Amino acid sequence: MSKRLTALIVLSLVIVLVGGAIYLRGPLQVAEDIGDGPREIEDLPKATAIVETDLYAEARDQMVEHGIIAYGIVSPEVIAVMRRVPRHQFVPEEYIHLAYENNPLPIGYGQTISQPFIVALMTQELDVEAGDKVLEIGTGSGYQAAVLAELDIEVFTIEIIESLANEAEQRLKEIAYENTHVRNADGYFGWPEEAPFDAIIVTAAPDHIPQPLLQQLKIGGVLVIPVGPIGGIQELWRVTRLSFDEFQSASLGGVRFVPFTRTRE
């Protein structure tokens, strides 16, 4: 898997809406029209489940070609899993007809399912391999966890909103992602009983990198996290643990994510 997506970090920046966030990236045309997009569900022909699945597969292919590969994602493994994960099963019913557009969508509780591009980018930057153990902070609807699970890794995911955690856990079980484990908790403290992790991914922006997450990384492990002020421009960081007390960080560009939610002290 590619260790870095260096083509994204350039001087000229374009503002793109991703994952309920603003992502500042390079000169690639990021507002590209994805053909006609998936048709409204009401307009789909009444046919068998197999035909319906094929229609979703075609929409996923269009999403991947025009919203992921065209924007610079190069990992064959990530591209393959983005073609497989049924995103329409992770959005509310009223948004199913928009499931394969390259946009974030509301999932309730003031949260969103991330834009497919940002999911692919962050997954690629984790640089995981089959058999790895990964911690996700911010389960949401479970889509990012499903993408990770398709890479044959063990996924531990934490969601602070109890209803979202319960719904995501049920959804992941129904789709048979048995290598996912959901916890309702404050993600700031990670999951110490299951540490260390080969990689950690955070899908909301704190104003600093939580120390517990750094300490729960294996030596050589990678943390991908947006950091910055609420409502302002943040940065997406890739942090590698080099030794017990040494870390190397690299910016992947400017972003704007929802704030990192904490339990009240």
Residue locations for each model-derived region?
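Conserved nucleotide-cofactor-binding alpha/beta core module
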Residues: 127-248
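Class I SAM-dependent transferase core
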Residues: 9-14, 21-135, 146-147, 151, ...
